[in-house]
Amino acid sequence: MEWKYIKKLKSIDLIDDFECLVKYVFCDEFRECVIANNGGRPSKKIFDTDKVKERVLKSFLSFNKEDRETVWKIFDWNKEELANKYVPFGIDNFGNLICFNANNDKIVFVNHEDMSVEAIAENFNGFMSKLYE
């Protein structure tokens, strides 16, 4: 898969710091993806949920605090709704979030307006394998 607009990760410690903030430990596959493609946009960006076909991933969120769309800003803006339930890592063009379910590591789509949730995949690898063009 090709990636565009990657923002070089300033420090691996940023991933650890975010994990401490949200009280969630990312899987190794996700950490490796962030290290290689922080804040990037994959060429395969379309995915289906259990309710809607052809949703579009705009980009992964950056772990660098000074970047425009970051896990830090998104979590801060939505912490009341997301706290202890969902950990954001991606965003679509409308501000909806792609998140880890903090209770079972499944990947979900969270509508930012009403916080409704749609299932995407059993885990991060499953999510990546479901992306298409």
Which residue stretches match the model-derived regions?
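A surface-exposed partner-binding patch
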Residues: 1-96
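Short, flexible loop/turn elements at secondary-structure junctions
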Residues: 93, 113-114
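Short, solvent-exposed coil/turn segments at beta-strand boundaries
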Residues: 85, 102-105
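Alpha-helix C-terminal capping segments
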Residues: 1, 100, 131-132
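Broad, structure-driven detector of short, well-ordered beta-strand segments within folded domains
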Residues: 96-102
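Compact, glycine/acidic-enriched structural inserts
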Residues: 117-133
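Short, compact, well-ordered microdomains
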Residues: 107-110
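Papain-like cysteine protease catalytic domains, especially those used for deubiquitination
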Residues: 63-64, 114, 118
